[in-house]
């Protein structure tokens, strides 16, 4: 309780100080200049952990490695060899700290530095569904760097460091994954029994604000955690099968059946169903190389039906743009968010969710051998580029009117470390990079 109070006090001071004291210190408007400034800020040698940007610099969010910077080692986004070294070193430093937290049984939404190499693990408002997912995402980034064609020595060094970390902390990660599996609860619906991580109480995913139970995004995160744990060799699938009473393929089919019974992915089963448009949310897209693999026609059909609902509904986008809001309506929130940051994960547009929406669209097109969504994906990315130049940096979120998101207590972050993911998906959508450098 005391640790939570201290962590909350530190965060309150940080956010309010940032809201009223932060100034813009650069005059850049060109996308290349903005990107270079962001990379110099996010991966500065003085940084001890990879964070979004102000005001989040005083807290560490493990989930962000899955949601917001899943491929910072993409060579197409790296400016030069120094940039590569800074990224690899900061990623390794961050992942090691997170693994130490797992070893200490601290699997929380947030880690708050408390001075002198001391840290406080805190769950803001609810327990996480995606903290282990973020830690595994960081490890996957390090180890999979060898799969990318790169001339940077730092990449191969990062691969080696990732393998050493995996070997050192494999037992701790396995224990944490089994603990997560043991926390799943039975949920009965139409005579069938499903396993949910939030059947009786909310769990957070992507951010801490939403207060609903039985959400698709939270349970998709748990499924993906199990799959990545198996693929990294941390845990054997048969051991998970014994714990869950079903294999992972069946577990995924169950989630699609439960949340997709209406023919689209319903955001939450908490409360009576509303209209289809009010029942979906943009975070259904999940994370990079996560829940959606698009290999099955039935899965693609559910994705397409949900995507089409969002694309066709005017309330889901900022007028005249391809900026899609998280929800057509504001969700049920904790009281503090209603007061301090209304619409934070509701009627606001998150560039990162839009980037992942575009990437899932491209996944759909690739597996269905079509160009169904390519133009929509390109439209999303074009408008994010425009917003980045207009607002002088890559935004954490944008208001429903297309402005910087601000409230009396919060001034949305310039999300420096989220910028590379945008460039990666831009190249995929257009076939050519948006920016190029000569090392």
Where are these regions (language model features)?
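Alpha-helix C-terminal capping/termination sites
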Residues: 62, 74, 78, 145-148, ...
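Active-site neighborhood of glycoside hydrolase catalytic domains
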Residues: 221-252
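Universal eukaryotic N-terminal targeting presequences
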Residues: 1-2
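Extended glycan-interaction surfaces of carbohydrate-active proteins
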Residues: 8, 12-60, 93-122, 179-213, ...
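Aromatic-rich carbohydrate-recognition surfaces in CAZymes
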Residues: 58-189, 219, 347-364, 374-377, ...
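Acidic, serine/threonine/proline-rich low-complexity intrinsically disordered regions
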Residues: 233-242, 296-300, 360-375, 436-437
